[in-house]
Structures are given as structure tokens and as C-alpha cells.
Amino acid sequence: MRECISIHVGQAGVQIGNACWELYCLEHGIQPDGQMPSDKTIGGGDDSFNTFFSETGAGKHVPRAVFVDLEPSVVDEVRSGTYRQLFHPEQLITGKEDAANNYARGHYTVGKELIDLVLDRIRKLADQCTGLQGFLIFHSFGGGTGSGFTSLLMERLSVDYGKKSKLEFSVYPAPQVSTAVVEPYNSILTTHTTLEHSDCAFMVDNEAIYDICRRNLDIERPSYTNLNRLIGQIVSSITASLRFDGALNVDLTEFQTNLVPYPRIHFPLATYAPVISAEKAYHEQLSVAEITNACFEPANQLVKCDPRHGKYMACCMLYRGDVVPKDVNAAIATIKTKRTIQFVDWCPTGFKVGINYQPPTVVPGGDLAKVQRAVCMLSNTTAIAEAWARLDHKFDLMYAKRAFVHWYVGEGMEEGEFSEAREDLAALEKDYEEVGVDSVDAEGEDEGEEY
């Protein structure tokens, strides 16, 4: 079996977790109490969904997930919500004081009191797996718990489970909408710490998702529930190949193999289509060609950046629903001929395709229309460096004045960590720049480079 353990850290992680597990349960026909009428075999059979759910002797399906927050209020909503019976009480872990948007509190002072308990629970989940393939970690960059505690957890997971894949789903601070002034600090500190521990990180930018909700779903003022349900659909598309028998199956390590050309360049850009409200869907025929085309519209991306200014290194199309390979090949051929998609010259235009015959499911009473087919595109493009550049710039503005730094130092951090993290991100931007340079021109001077 190829099990995956999901770890949801901090408010953003937990709330995205709620949306994801709600959707998984609907997709697999699992009731909120964990019973699954369609599953006739009692005990852990070799059903594909057992990658995400473990099965008890009584036929109850329990998510292989841990929810962690340093303060109780958000996880308490899970404890008293619709799905309270789905999770084992030990899977919901909370501390008493929050990280107060402070990376240092999440990573050092408050985080270290909880980390051993969390690792212990993760160990219990890992012991129930016959062949654990890795971890999916959900968190935000901006919050104290999401940034500080996650990076501490990643370091410890690398020690305990060295070779297992670790994929992150990270909420990137939106360029305009901000929940904390110190987001740039937290983001850069957490990215620096987790860079060497994460195998692949899918970033989600709140503002990009706000815009998609406003533009495509006509929601005037999107709430976090609207955003998270959309994020849930994307996570579901990425993990569908692990949970269903697909025609072309993709597992966790396969993503990395196809999307990550160098260990540090592991931030694929995700795009999802069609995002459409029920009123509109009724009048539109969404063919494979149309949804494939939509993936190359910057408007449908989950991070604000412009791939037309960058180059693609790899591209992975995950289709689900009523899709046949012939249509996909035709759609991709069309795109290759007329699109201005620039691949780096050291990577022949490779599209990796996955097809899953399970159509997308929607949450009843949600905003998304029920569609016959959908696609999620994961592409590794140099354009995502724009997102880092924006963040680094904000960091520089504050750090030049050493604003707010005393809060971090007061929690046991050293000021040197700031400059070290910032240098690491400058190096990351440089890495992206070098990857996009044509190898023919650069051959002479780059002899001494490590690549």
C-alpha cells in the first residue's frame, strides 16, 4: 500500500484540511461518522482510498491526518463540527497559547513544547501504514504557527523519516490582502528553514484565489470557506491519482521526478479549470480543449505571476472525469503549435499527463458547478520567482529599519538568522534566473557552476 499522512498546521492548514476531508468523504462515499456503505470488505483491504483512510475492525474509516495548532479555537471547531466523529480525538492536537504571528514563537518557545507530542501521534499513524510513501503538509507562510511550527516539524520529520517524500501546500501571503504585518518575515524565515527539507511545495496565493472566486464564481466578497473549498478541489485533483485507480497513475515520488529539475527549484505553479458557477455551466460546453487552454491563462493560476515572462521547465496535466487520451493529445498538440509557451532549451517540451476516470465531485450547496471533466495543471516555471521577489522586497523594506525584529529576538532567535534567511532567498531567486538562461550562450562562463 502507498499511504500518505496529511498534516494540517495552524489556522490556514486546519481550515484547508476541513475543506479537503469534507471533499474526500464525498468523493469516496464516506459518511461523517466514518461509515462507508459501498465498502463491502471489512478491515484494511487494498482499496485505493486506503492510501488516505485507515479502516478499523468495525468498518469505520479514519483519515490518516493530524491537525495541529498552538491555540485551540480553530481545532475546537473541528471537534464540534459535522465531521467530529470522523477523526480520532488524538489526531486533533492543540496547545494553549498561540504563536501570535511570530515565527520565533512557533519554532522555538511555544512550538518546542508541542513538537514531541505531535511526532508521537505521527509515529502512531505511520505504524499503521504498510508502506508509507510520504507526508502532505498544509500550512500558511504568514502565520506564526504555520511558519514556525511547520519548519520545526519538517526538520524533525527529516530526521525521523529521512527518505519519505514531504510535499507542502503553502498559503502564500497575498500581495494586497494581508492578515499580519510581519508576514514577509515569517515567510522568508520558514522558506529558508524548510527549503532543504521539502521535496515539493505547491503555493497558493490568497489574492489569486479571491480573484478567481470574484471573477469566475461571481462572489462579491469571498469568505475563507469559499477560498478553501476551491483549494480543496485542487488538492483533491492532485491527490486523486493516489486515491482512485487511474488510467495513468501518478504517485508522490512521480510528481517530484517530473516536476523538480533541481532540489531547490521545487515550487510548481498550480492552475485549475474549470472554475465555474452553476448558472454559467448550464450554458457552456466545457470540452477537453477548452479546459486545457484555460490552464494557460494566468487568471486561473493559484499564484500571481506571469508565465509568459518566464520559461517552463516541466508541465504536468492531471485530468479527471470524462476524458480520453485522444482528446488530450489533440488539445496539447494545439497548444504547442499556437501558444507562446517557452520551455527552457535544456528540457524538450514534455507534458506529463495523468487521467482519472472519477469525475470531480462538488460540495452540496457550494459555489462550484458539477462538471463532467476538470484538469489541474502543475507546471514548474521560472515565473514563480516573481512571487519570491515581491516577498523579498517587502522583507527588505521592514528589515532595513529593523522593524518588529525585537519580538523575534525576544523569543530566543538571533538577528543573524534574518540575514541568513534573506541571503538564502536571494540565492533562490538567482537559481531561478540561472535555470532560465539558455545553455548555449552560457556554456563558456558557467563551466565552474555546480549545475
From Swiss-Prot:
Listed GO biological process terms: microtubule-based process
Broad class of the protein's primary localization: cytoplasm
Enzyme class at the top of the EC tree: hydrolase
E.C. no: 3.6.5.-
Binding site for Mg(2+): 71
Modification note: Undergoes a tyrosination/detyrosination cycle, the cyclic removal and re-addition of a C-terminal tyrosine residue by the enzymes tubulin tyrosine carboxypeptidase (TTCP) and tubulin tyrosine ligase (TTL), respectively. Acetylation of alpha chains at Lys-40 stabilizes microtubules and affects affinity and processivity of microtubule motors. This modification has a role in multiple cellular functions, ranging from cell motility, cell cycle progression or cell differentiation to intracellular trafficking and signaling.
Pfam families: Tubulin, Tubulin_C
Cofactor (UniProt): Mg(2+)
Gene Ontology CC annotations of this record: cytoplasm; microtubule
Record-annotated membrane-spanning stretches: none
Metal-binding in keyword set: yes
Entries under CDD domains matching the protein: alpha_tubulin
Entry keyword set: Acetylation, Cytoplasm, Cytoskeleton, GTP-binding, Hydrolase, Magnesium, Metal-binding, Microtubule, Nucleotide-binding
Positions where N6-acetyllysine occurs in the chain: 40
Gene Ontology terms, MF aspect: GTP binding; hydrolase activity; metal ion binding; structural constituent of cytoskeleton
Active-site annotation: 254
Reaction catalysed by this enzyme: GTP + H2O = GDP + phosphate + H(+)
Entry superkingdom: Eukaryota
Subcellular location: Cytoplasm, Cytoskeleton
Site positions for Involved in polymerization: 451
Residues bound to GTP: 11, 71, 140, 144-145, 179, 206, 228
Subunit note: Dimer of alpha and beta chains. A typical microtubule is a hollow water-filled tube with an outer diameter of 25 nm and an inner diameter of 15 nM. Alpha-beta heterodimers associate head-to-tail to form protofilaments running lengthwise along the microtubule wall with the beta-tubulin subunit facing the microtubule plus end conferring a structural polarity. Microtubules usually have 13 protofilaments but different protofilament numbers can be found in some organisms and specialized cells.
Main function: Tubulin is the major constituent of microtubules, a cylinder consisting of laterally associated linear protofilaments composed of alpha- and beta-tubulin heterodimers. Microtubules grow by the addition of GTP-tubulin dimers to the microtubule end, where a stabilizing cap forms. Below the cap, tubulin dimers are in GDP-bound state, owing to GTPase activity of alpha-tubulin.
Family, as annotated: Belongs to the tubulin family.
Name of protein: Tubulin alpha-1 chain
Species in which this protein is naturally found: Aplysia californica
